[in-house]
């Protein structure tokens, strides 16, 4: 029975160590990404907009179009953008 506990303990330790290593790698990558945003900002690019562009590029085209349509509807309802002209108005 002691041998089974030893094996489980070793497996648990291995999982924990792998997770810790991956967490450290994740932190390193996050720091690298932060540095790239800083570099882009120093060259005159807006980091907030860069993040938005990356977010948009991750989306499926249909999903993005649907979200843009909903956003336009909300903005029109609030009077923040003019309502789209209908074909009848032309």
Curated annotation (Swiss-Prot):
Cystine bridges? none
Molecular functions per Gene Ontology:
DNA binding
Membrane-spanning residues where? none
Taxonomy, superkingdom: Bacteria
Similarity field: Belongs to the UPF0335 family.
Q: Which HAMAP family match?
A: UPF0335
Protein name, entry field: UPF0335 protein Smed_2680
The organism is Sinorhizobium medicae (strain WSM419)
Organism placement in taxonomy: Bacteria, Pseudomonadati, Pseudomonadota, Alphaproteobacteria, Hyphomicrobiales
């Amino acid at each position: 029975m002691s041998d089974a506990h030893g094996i489980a303990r070793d497996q648990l330790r291995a999982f924990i160590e792998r997770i810790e290593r991956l967490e450290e790698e994740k932190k390193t990558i996050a720091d690298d990404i932060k540095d790239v945003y800083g570099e882009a900002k120093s060259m005159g690019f807006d980091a907030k907009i860069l993040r938005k562009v990356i977010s948009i590029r991750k989306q499926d085209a249909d999903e993005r179009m649907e979200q843009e349509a909903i956003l336009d509807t909300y903005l029109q309802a609030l009077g923040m953008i003019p309502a789209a002209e209908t074909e009848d108005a032309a």
